[in-house]
Regions:
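Active-site palm subdomain of RNA-directed nucleic acid polymerases
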Residues: 55, 208-252, 256-257, 266, ...
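RNase H catalytic domain
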Residues: 438-503, 507
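A short, polar/acidic, helix/strand-boundary loop motif
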Residues: 192-210, 214, 307, 409-432, ...
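C-terminal reverse transcriptase regions that engage the nucleic-acid substrate
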Residues: 142, 156, 271-384, 499
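Reverse-transcribing Pol proteins
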Residues: 11-146, 193, 230-235, 333-364
Length: 706
């Protein structure tokens, strides 16, 4: 029969120990009352069985501080500190507690001593930690770069439905003894007494590296036997595919740590395997594979953001502290990186303006306040997926100095840059290509994971990191990309694709069809708008040559309302159309079918088959457009149309509603008069000698210049 797990219990059978039970198995935990500072030295014989590393054995028995070459550790001034009565009582109690443990000892002055100030920090459990302010002394300590595990190391190890546990070492730093000859550097004064640390203090710069290095052989020996474990200073995360695997890891780790002299904190450890574990302020869930902030941590961050949001002129330090909280929450807040960089950039700018003075005041922009509001509204519900799902859509993009291109499945698109855009850095253009690709090919995609493949490493980095700090311009575009995706509840990821494998998107960014890009001069368009507008949609346009904000493109386009004008109804909005000449006949059919009304720009070619139909659909006299070199130009190069001298364009207000056509024709019959020549009344489309008059179904059509 399966024995239910129980919590840590105190037993009378084993003196000064607790017993941890799990499914009929157990192991002892040494009582925390047994703790004495520097106790690792009493277990040096066990450390020697584990490692022969001289540096580690020295640290275990009498750790020596590593000084910079040539450092003298001279102290010029000893600052006098003042504390209020409440602070004094807290410090008195903490000093007494530390003296009882042997962490502090009373001493006398000696040559070469270094006396530092002290301060306290409130801990989560409401007690206080005494900290030696070694900022000045640390300038003499040798710095070594080292790798320390983080919460991300833990998250990377989590697998679906795995079991997890954690072990917390009690007073971990205080377990490591400081060599007697180096204790004189760790002194402070209190109420006429001179006190010094006998072990690692909180605040010594080399301690995190030394403690991490000290535990390396410990965890290496456990990993060699198959235990999955991640240490972080005094905390250890343990994992197993089954409850028993995880339990055995807990048992082996706890017993080994105790054999080496460490005391395990039973209240802060989680010995019994579980699938939802709180570790380092994060809630790790292997069932749904997510990470969340603990409620306390989320509330603290929300309160900090609210306070900053309400501050009129916060100090730069206030802003920096909130940014620190935001960044530390990143493993559990999916969109963290998207909503902190504006604040970070403004902090950097403010520091430059104030010559590095963190106590100077700054003003937050509307954008920064908007980001803060996002945190206030969302941080308590935020989570982050440990393993994003496989992509549903894969899209390749590319950019050149000429234009952009994109490919999704068998659909391709691309376009030229405007002259101003072409001047931008290629990294900006590559990111803009991604934005245009999403707008063009994924506008209607919802609830999907979209993978972007790019041969530009900056693009990959800025998408995966939701922005970056090196380029403000790239960061702005990256934020637009993500906001576009989030509005559609899509998730983005990016991967690098070698340029040799990105040929289709590359081609789209360099090869263009300019025959569809001719644009009517904006002054002429404005005159037409005043005459017959305003127009609500441009039916044949692109991002660069659109005359109206709402437009339809002939291929996927980042700003288009729709693709292919013939795929939508034209009857709802007064339209402006400047179609390719080969599509004029089809446009007239569409206008009739949809009973639409609008302006169409066409060449005055009476010999074309569509011409009689066009004239019969008029509801206002056509306007001839001036034959000028700049009438038609390509927007990206301002090149003029090669036929501008020979081609006469006209603007026609047409309708697909027969009653409106007949009403216009009737008015012309009533108002027409002779211009000195006779036209055959039966002619369907005859042109007068003046070149500006036509007869359509017996009605004289007189053209005038715009």
């Amino acid at each position: 029969m399966r024995t239910p797990p129980v919590n840590v219990q105190t037993t009378n059978e084993v003196r000064n120990t607790n017993i941890v039970f799990f499914q009929g198995d157990c192991f002892p935990i040494i009582s925390t009352t047994q703790f004495k500072a520097g106790r690792l030295k009493d277990f040096a014989h066990n450390w020697k069985k584990l490692t022969s590393d001289a540096f580690i054995l020295d640290t275990v028995q009498h750790c020596h501080i590593e000084f910079k070459q040539g450092s003298s550790c001279d102290q010029h001034n000893v600052r006098v500190q003042k504390f209020n009565s409440t602070e004094q009582n807290i410090i008195d109690a903490e000093i007494l507690r530390l003296c009882e443990k042997g962490v502090l000892e009373e001493t006398t002055h000696c040559k070469g001593e270094f006396i530092s100030p002290i301060f306290t920090r409130r801990k989560k459990d409401g007690t206080y930690r005494l900290i030696l302010n070694l900022k000045e002394f640390n300038e003499n300590v040798e710095y070594h770069h080292f790798k320390m595990e983080s919460i991300q190391s833990v998250i990377n190890m989590v697998t679906p439905n795995c079991f997890m546990a954690s072990i917390d070492i009690k007073d971990a730093y205080y377990s490591v003894p400081i060599a007697p000859e180096h204790r004189k550097y760790l002194r402070f004064k209190w109420k006429g007494k001179l006190l010094q640390y006998t072990c690692f203090p909180n605040g010594l710069a080399c301690c995190p590296r030394l403690f991490t290095k000290l535990l390396k052989p410990v965890y290496a020996s456990l990993r060699q036997t198959g235990d999955e474990i991640v240490p972080y200073i005094d905390d250890s995360y343990l994992q197993g595919d089954t409850e028993q695997e995880c339990w055995q890891s807990v048992k082996k780790t706890a017993l080994l740590l105790q054999d080496l002299g460490f005391i395990i904190h039973p209240d802060k450890s989680v010995f019994l395997p579980k699938r939802v574990l709180t570790f380092l302020g994060f809630v790790i869930n292997s069932i749904d594979m997510t990470v969340q902030l603990t409620p306390a941590k989320a509330n603290h961050l929300r309160e900090a953001c609210t306070k900053l949001l309400n501050a009129q002129h916060p100090t730069i330090r206030d802003v920096a502290q909130v940014i620190g909280l935001m960044v530390s929450s990143a493993p559990a807040v999916e969109l963290c990186m998207l909503f902190y960089r504006t604040l970070e950039n403004e902090k950097i700018d403010a520091l430059k303006e104030n010559h590095g003075d963190f106590d100077a005041r700054m003003e937050l922009s509307a954008s920064a306040k908007s980001d803060l509001q996002w945190w206030v509204d969302n941080v308590q519900q935020s989570e982050k997926k440990i393993s994003p799902p496989n992509p549903d859509i894969v899209m390749t993009t590319d950019a050149s100095k000429q234009g952009w291109g994109a490919v999704r499945d068998h659909h391709t698109t691309g376009g030229r840059w405007s002259p101003a855009e072409a001047e931008k850095h290629i990294n900006e253009l590559e990111l803009k290509a991604v934005f245009f690709a999403l707008c063009s090919l994924c506008d209607n995609v919802r609830n999907k994971h979209i993978r972007i493949l790019s041969d530009n490493t900056t693009t990959v980095c800025y998408i995966n990191n939701m922005g970056g700090s090196k380029s403000r311009a790239c960061n702005i575009i990256a934020k637009k990309i993500w906001q576009f995706a989030l509005e559609r509840n899509n998730f983005l990821s990016s991967a690098h694709l070698p340029g040799t494998q990105n040929m289709l998107a590359d081609r789209e960014s360099r090869v263009f069809n300019d025959r569809t890009e001719w644009m009517l001069h904006q002054d002429i368009f404005q005159k037409l708008s005043l005459l017959w507008g305003p127009f609500e949609i441009d039916l044949f346009a692109s991002r660069l040559n659109k005359q109206v904000c709402t437009y339809v493109s002939w291929k996927p386009d980042p700003g288009a309302t729709a693709v292919d004008a013939f795929s939508i109804l034209w009857d709802r909005k007064p339209f402006y159309a400047f179609p390719p000449f080969s599509l004029i006949h089809r446009c007239l059919q569409k206008i009739i079918a949809d009973k639409a009304e609008g302006v169409i720009i066409v060449p005055m070619w009476p010999t074309q088959t569509y011409y009689p139909r066009l004239m019969s659909m008029l509801i206002q006299m056509p306007r001839l457009l001036p034959r000028k070199e700049n009438l038609l130009r390509l927007p990206h190069s301002q090149k003029s149309h090669p036929l501008w001298k020979k081609m006469q364009l006209m603007a026609c207000l047409v309708s697909g509603i027969v009653s409106k056509q007949k009403e216009f024709q009737k008015k012309q019959e009533e108002s027409c008069c002779s211009h000195g020549e006779n036209l055959p009344g039966t002619s369907m489309a005859s042109i007068s000698k003046s070149g500006n008059n036509f007869v359509v179904k017996g009605t004289l059509i007189h053209m005038t210049y715009l």
